Structures are given as structure tokens and as C-alpha cells.
């Protein structure tokens, strides 16, 4: 093996100090360096390996100093073909990724390599992925609602501009579809820049997302960064930081409001757990890494608003076995401004988005921020739905006939509200054949207020299913009556 390795990741000159591999355990590689030339933590190292008919450069990230001139590193690529004695060079800086307009419309990996147009961005400005969060005096104190046009979200769990939103749910309840819908709406309605981080999810989903965004004409305003589930844990652990670094450039240098989508933040935690075990750390509760809270905090604290600019983050969070006490989702809760829980029972009823209106929360749902009228209507909707939930056991055992008359009226109203909370999505048009609806917040508040007051109790329940506004409900009711 050659002693010199050409640096190809990051801008600027590296230190090019040569070490050698002394131990390889899967993705964990121990490297020995000359005395006095030990690389810093998080530095990127390069090792050249030769496989049959192909030579490639491995990127290793320094994770621990072991003493005796040894460092323990985590490989960002499979270590097939890496042997003891292989020469390793220190780049002198962390993993760096391209930033700026050059990343829009392209797909990158965690190392900043462009996958759809190789070489894109490597000649321009690059930032290291390990960065400090904004100083306290730079943070934005003003609270502003991010209007999405999705009724259940805008009314019951309003998103804060520059905040962190969690999409909780088990497998197959619609987290990725809701993220795709938000990307489409932000690009179409607000002409905003989006950065998408695919963390440990299916490669097929990443391909589908790229093709759909290209088809809908929103790809040119979006940067995609993928570290999929077939890649080593080091890549899956760092891909969210790579995407966040690109988003920080748009916020701090270009002064833009940016949306950062992370799918799935649980895979970030899962990758950290794998790396922690490989590094020999003692596991904590349920086998997770002892540094879980610290790693989550380092990521989440960088996602914030500075004066006049913001990064709003929408994070899909897989809940293992639908257990919300699991340390991974529980640790994430502490950082979120709003939580949108996607419910399997609601999904099975055919109501989409399958948002649970009683368990989803938002810290800005208070009169001083959203206004007294919005607050009153949201609480009335929740009151009716909560009462309906309490009556369901009685209905299941004794039937509707045993309810008092006022409870029968409330149940009918609750079912209409429940169905009206769903609506057609733009990204689902080709599956449903129905156009997606965007409902202004003002219209949403008025519509739910009128339904709560009983103005539409005479219309059939099915007329409220997947409708946008009240005009759609009345049109559906006429269609049903015509049959």
C-alpha cells in the first residue's frame, strides 16, 4: 500500500500525516500515528484500499484516543479489503460537505459526494459537519405560526416557524407521506428552500422521493442527503449533521428561511447505539448508548431561529412497537415545539393524515400566540372528541340506543369532526384521483366552529370525509343525496 493518500473530502489543505491500520473490527478501525501527530477527535482520515479491478478511498472519523499513539475510528464505508498495515492520512479537519445553491436539485451522501452528478460542489465552498449552535444573543425571540394548509395541523397542533416538529408513529401510518406533502407545500406555496435528510430509511423510498419531487417540479429548491439503511452505522449517524450543515449555510449566509426534513430521527439514535456498542461503551437503558441525550442535544440545538432567519425542522420519529416510553422517542420529546402523533386506529378508519387530535400537542396553542378565537375553537373540537372517546365503551357494549339524546347528538357531531379533520394530499393525487386541498387557517377555524355549533348536523357523515372546506362538504352531500 502507498504511504501517501490524496485528500478528496473537504476544502483547504490537510495535514497529510501518515498512520497505519493496526486493527479492523467491522466498521471500527484502530490506527497508529507517529508520536506528536495524533489527529483530533472528529477529524476525517483517508485510507486507500484496492479491491478486484477497483481502488477506492475509505473515510474514517476519529471517535476515541486510546493512548500509545492509537486512535479508534469509525468507517463511513464498508471496510471490505482493508487490512492491517494500510497507510492512513489525516486530513486535518472534519468531514466537510458542499454548501450554497450548488447543492439544490442534487442528491448527496453523508460525505458530501454528489450521487446524481459526481463531482458537483467539490470545487466550491465547503463546511465541516461538526459546528457549534448559534450563540444565545443571536437567537430569535419572536414566535410565528407556520401555516401549512393542513386543517388538523393548523388548528390543533400548529407548527412554529423555526421550531422543531416531531411526527410520531409506528410503521406504515403515513410519516413519510406527510413529510413529502410538507416539502411539496412549502416549495409551491412559499417558494422556500428545503433540505431532506434520509437517515437509515429504505433506498426505495429515497428513489421514489427523488422521482416524485422531480415530477412535481420542486426538486430545484431542495437538497437531498441520504444515508440509507444498507450503509454502515457511521454514515447513518452523520447524515443528519451533513444535511443540517447545508441548511445552516442557507440560514446564516443567504439569510433564508429553511425547512429541514429528517426521516427518520429514530435511525439516527439507532446508528448511535450501534457505534457505541462497537466502540466498547457500556449500554444504557434498553440497550441504547449512554450518550443518547448528549448526541440528540448536539443535533437538535443547532436547529433554531436566528434573528430574521430560521430553520424549521420536521422530523419523522419511528416508535418501536408503538411504545412511547422507549428511550429513543422519549429523549426526542424534550426538544420538540410540536408533536404530531399518527394513529394506527385512525389510519385503519381511512382518515388521512391519520393525526390523533387528542394526543398531538403544540406549545404555541395558547391565546396569546394563536388568538382567542383559534384557541377556543381548538379546545371545543378536542372537548367533543374526548367526550366521544369516553362514550365509545358504552356504545360498543349497549349500542347507540342506550345513550341520552344529547349524547347521541354529540356522537354524530364528533364523527363529522373526525372525518373533516382528514383531507386529500397533493402527493396522493395520482393514487386517489382527487386534487389535494390547501385550506387557509382562517377558513379552517370558521369551518370547525360552525360544525361544533351544529350547523351541519343535518348533512350525512360521509360527506365530511377527506374534504377541504365546507364548500366541498356541501357538494359531497348533494352528490350523496342525488344517488
Swiss-Prot record:
Keywords: ATP synthesis, ATP-binding, Cell membrane, CF(1), Hydrogen ion transport, Ion transport, Membrane, Nucleotide-binding, Translocase, Transport. One of its GO terms (molecular function) is ATP hydrolysis activity. ATP binds at residues 169-176. It is a peripheral membrane protein. It holds the Pfam family ATP-synt_ab_N. It catalyses: ATP + H2O + 4 H(+)(in) = ADP + phosphate + 5 H(+)(out). Its EC number is 7.1.2.2. One of its GO terms (cellular component) is plasma membrane. InterPro entries: AAA+_ATPase, ATP-synt_VA_C, ATP_synth_F1_bsu, ATPase_a/bsu_AS, ATPase_alpha/beta_chains, ATPase_F1/V1/A1_a/bsu_N, ATPase_F1/V1/A1_a/bsu_N_sf, ATPase_F1/V1/A1_a/bsu_nucl-bd. It is found in: Cell membrane. PROSITE patterns: ATPASE_ALPHA_BETA. F-type ATPases have 2 components, CF(1) - the catalytic core - and CF(0) - the membrane proton channel. CF(1) has five subunits: alpha(3), beta(3), gamma(1), delta(1), epsilon(1). CF(0) has three main subunits: a(1), b(2) and c(9-12). The alpha and beta chains form an alternating ring which encloses part of the gamma chain. CF(1) is attached to CF(0) by a central stalk formed by the gamma and epsilon chains, while a peripheral stalk is formed by the delta and b chains. Belongs to the ATPase alpha/beta chains family. NCBIfam families: atpD. Produces ATP from ADP in the presence of a proton gradient across the membrane. The catalytic sites are hosted primarily by the beta subunits. This is ATP synthase subunit beta. It comes from Rhodococcus jostii (strain RHA1). The lineage of its organism: Bacteria, Bacillati, Actinomycetota, Actinomycetes, Mycobacteriales.
Amino acid at each position: 500500500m502507498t504511504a501517501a493518500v490524496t485528500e478528496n473530502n473537504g476544502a483547504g489543505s490537510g495535514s497529510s500525516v501518515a498512520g497505519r491500520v493496526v486493527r479492523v473490527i467491522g466498521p471500527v478501525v484502530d490506527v497508529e500515528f507517529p508520536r506528536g501527530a495524533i489527529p483530533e477527535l472528529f477529524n476525517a482520515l483517508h485510507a486507500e484500499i484496492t479491491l478486484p479491478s477497483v481502488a477506492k478511498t475509505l473515510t474514517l472519523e476519529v471517535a476515541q484516543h486510546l493512548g500509545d499513539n492509537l486512535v479508534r475510528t469509525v468507517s463511513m464505508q464498508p471496510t471490505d479489503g482493508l487490512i492491517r498495515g494500510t497507510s492512513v492520512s489525516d486530513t486535518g479537519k472534519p468531514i466537510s460537505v458542499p454548501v450554497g445553491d450548488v447543492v439544490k436539485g442534487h442528491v448527496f451522501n453523508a460525505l458530501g459526494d454528489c450521487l446524481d452528478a459526481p463531482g458537483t460542489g467539490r470545487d466550491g465552498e465547503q463546511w465541516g459537519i461538526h459546528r457549534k449552535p448559534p450563540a444565545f444573543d443571536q437567537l430569535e425571540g419572536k414566535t410565528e405560526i407556520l401555516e401549512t394548509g393542513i386543517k388538523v395541523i393548523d388548528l390543533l397542533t400548529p407548527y412554529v416557524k423555526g421550531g422543531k416538529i416531531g411526527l410520531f408513529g409506528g410503521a406504515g401510518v403515513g410519516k413519510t407521506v406527510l413529510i413529502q406533502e410538507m416539502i411539496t407545500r412549502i416549495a409551491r406555496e412559499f417558494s422556500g428552500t428545503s433540505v431532506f435528510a434520509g437517515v437509515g430509511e429504505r433506498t426505495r423510498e429515497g428513489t421514489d422521493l427523488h422521482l416524485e419531487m422531480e415530477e412535481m417540479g420542486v426538486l430545484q429548491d431542495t437538497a437531498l442527503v441520504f444515508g440509507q439503511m444498507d450503509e454502515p452505522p457511521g454514515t447513518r449517524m452523520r447524515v443528519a449533521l451533513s444535511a443540517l450543515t447545508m441548511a445552516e449555510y442557507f440560514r446564516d449566509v443567504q439569510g433564508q428561511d429553511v425547512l429541514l426534513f429528517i426521516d427518520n430521527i429514530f435511525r439516527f439514535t439507532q446508528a448511535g447505539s450501534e457505534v457505541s456498542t462497537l466502540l466498547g461503551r457500556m449500554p444504557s437503558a434498553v440497550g441504547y448508548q449512554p450518550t443518547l441525550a448528549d448526541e440528540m442535544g448536539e443535533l437538535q440545538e443547532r436547529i433554531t431561529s436566528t434573528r430574521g432567519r430560521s430553520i424549521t425542522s420536521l422530523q419523522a420519529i419511528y416508535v418501536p412497537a408503538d411504545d412511547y416510553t422507549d428511550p429513543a422517542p422519549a429523549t426526542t420529546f424534550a426538544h420538540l415545539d410540536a408533536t404530531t402523533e399518527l394513529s394506527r386506529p385512525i389510519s385503519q378508519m381511512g382518515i388521512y393524515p391519520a393525526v390523533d387530535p387528542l394526543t398531538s400537542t403544540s406549545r404555541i396553542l395558547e391565546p396569546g400566540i394563536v388568538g382567542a378565537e383559534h384557541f377556543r375553537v381548538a379546545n371545543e373540537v378536542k372537548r367533543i372528541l374526548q367526550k366521544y372517546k369516553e362514550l365509545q365503551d358504552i356504545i360498543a357494549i349497549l349500542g347507540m340506543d342506550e345513550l341520552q339524546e344529547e349524547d347521541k347528538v354529540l356522537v354524530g357531531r364528533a364523527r363529522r369532526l373526525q372525518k373533516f379533520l382528514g383531507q386529500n394530499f397533493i402527493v396522493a393525487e395520482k393514487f386517489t384521483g382527487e386534487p389535494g386541498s390547501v385550506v387557509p387557517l382562517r377558513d379552517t377555524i370558521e369551518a370547525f366552529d360552525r360544525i361544533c355549533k351544529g350547523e351541519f348536523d343535518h348533512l350525512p357523515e360521509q360527506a365530511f370525509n377527506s374534504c377541504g372546506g365546507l364548500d366541498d362538504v356541501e357538494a359531497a352531500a348533494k352528490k350523496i343525496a342525488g344517488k
